């Protein structure tokens, strides 16, 4: 699963996801992409599950690019623990995804296979997405 090799601090504030994506909203690598429509935190496990679903549907042909990286540590306290006594330990890693952000790109397969693969990958994610296609020049 994806996570940073080294971070400056173990824990971060929760933060909010305001506004549209400031970058990463165009297809840079593949012919087809999966674009986020709403803001949400996406965990490393969800990204990996979507990647596996896309790769499996493409039968390991073509190429898949992951355009989001989980760099936000999310902490949680154990169950049935009283409030207070500090912030919980880091539990998992997440990526803050803004609306308009391209999350996955695929290339090297037929259009119908690519769209079906991205649709199956989108089912593993907690946000509404849209399949986008590069406009032929």
UniProtKB/Swiss-Prot annotation:
General function of this protein = Binds 23S rRNA and is also seen to make contacts with the A and possibly P site tRNAs.
Q: Is Phosphoprotein among the key words of this record?
A: no
What one GO molecular function would you report for this record? tRNA binding
Q: Which HAMAP family match?
A: Ribosomal_uL16
Which superkingdom?
A: Bacteria
Lineage of the source organism? Bacteria, Pseudomonadati, Pseudomonadota, Alphaproteobacteria, Hyphomicrobiales
The entry describes its oligomerization and partners as: Part of the 50S ribosomal subunit.
Any GO BP: translation
- Gene3D superfamilies in alphabetical order: Ribosomal protein L10e/L16 (3.90.1170.10)
Query: What family does this belong to?
Result: Belongs to the universal ribosomal protein uL16 family.
Protein name listed in UniProt: Large ribosomal subunit protein uL16
Alphabetical GO CC annotations of the entry are:
cytosolic large ribosomal subunit
Q: Print the keywords alphabetically.
A: Ribonucleoprotein, Ribosomal protein, RNA-binding, rRNA-binding, tRNA-binding
